[in-house]
Amino acid sequence: MGENMEREMLRPKTIAMDQNSASARSNPEREIKTGRLEPASNSAPTMAIDLQAVTMIYRDKTVVDSLSFGVRAGECFGLLGPNGAGKSTITRMLLGMATPSAGKISVLGLPVPGKARLARASIGVVSQFDNLDMEFTVRENLLVFGRYFQMSTRAIEKLIPSLLEFAQLEAKADVRVSDLSGGMKRRLTLARALVNDPQLLILDEPTTGLDPPARHQIWERLRSLLIRGKTILLTTHMMDEAERMCDRLCVLEGGRMIAEGPPLSLIEDIIGCPVIEVYGGNPDELSLIVRPHVDRIETSGETLFCYTVNSDQVRAKLREFPSLRLLERPANLEDVFLRLTGREMEK
């Protein structure tokens, strides 16, 4: 998502702000199996996002193909797929920036694109790139962004301290954005998306280009938002990010859903055993040697993926090839994608 789309979607009507509105909306919290706190509910969970048989055709090309999924209020739902899978197109349709060729979309209980502007008043967006005003200070960026929502200067200034605390940028309030590190800029971009106290956050590749410590800081901030009852739609091509953050996810390929469910369930149901990666030999020749001792074999480039619970037998068979490198690890979402498509995900 680029700057033009982000600025276009920031045309909502006046929003009544209340710093306590998130907690006011939340019910008592309960512990769930993931260890995350989520709002409890005595009724069926409401759907923050609902797509029904949505198709998008652009220049005679089907970009999104009869896609259906729902995102429950209070969960983190992932759209996982390579570039060109349809993630950005789905996001544009959710924001009312593109009209589907067929199907129905509902966001926060409102039909989109019909009432997209009203829905956007309760949505925060973090685009893939930091669309910050580099010559402004951290504080000034938050102040200017709040005015897109027709908030008064007084209301924004009252909110800024809590946003700075959330982004862990209290000491950088009067520093120009151009002087911040990449991780600080991403935290500021995330805090900026909270100015209007949104119910739903749409995050497009939120940690792309960050080093591991900065990525973990962003993930920690996102978890705190989920505890507060926010709903997150996360688009990513990073398997570890999807596995760590998402309660459920939809795996996309060519605009089609090829799998949907909780990450660990997908891994268990589709893979179900550890993996040994074998490097440094001819995959075709090696596969003939180990095939009797594995459940399944996949090949990608020069790497042989052996899916097996009999790792000792596989290692024993490969000892006569001292130049080989072996990596034994638990299965992950990369293996799921490789199994479903026959190739590794393109970054």
From Swiss-Prot:
GO molecular function: ATP binding; ATP hydrolysis activity; transmembrane transporter activity
Residue segments, region Disordered: 1-32
EC assignment: 7.6.2.-
UniProt domain ABC transporter: residue ranges: 49-279
Transmembrane residue ranges: none
Domain of life of the organism encoding this protein: Bacteria
Residues that hold ATP according to the record: 81-88
Biased composition (Polar residues): 17-26
Keywords: ATP-binding, Cell inner membrane, Cell membrane, Membrane, Nodulation, Nucleotide-binding, Translocase, Transport
EC top class named in words: translocase
Biased composition (Basic and acidic residues): 1-11
GO CC field: plasma membrane
Entry keyword annotation includes Iron-sulfur: no
Predominant cellular place of this UniProt entry's protein: membrane
Database matches in SUPFAM superfamilies: P-loop containing nucleoside triphosphate hydrolases
Compartments where located: Cell inner membrane
Membrane-topology annotation of the record: Peripheral membrane protein
Protein task: Part of the ABC transporter complex NodIJ involved in the export of the nodulation factors (Nod factors), the bacterial signal molecules that induce symbiosis and subsequent nodulation induction. Nod factors are LCO (lipo-chitin oligosaccharide), a modified beta-1,4-linked N-acetylglucosamine oligosaccharide. This subunit is responsible for energy coupling to the transport system.
Subunit structure: The complex is composed of two ATP-binding proteins (NodI) and two transmembrane proteins (NodJ).
Family designation: Belongs to the ABC transporter superfamily. Lipooligosaccharide exporter (TC 3.A.1.102) family.
Protein name: Nod factor export ATP-binding protein I
Organism: Neorhizobium galegae
Gene for this chain: nodI
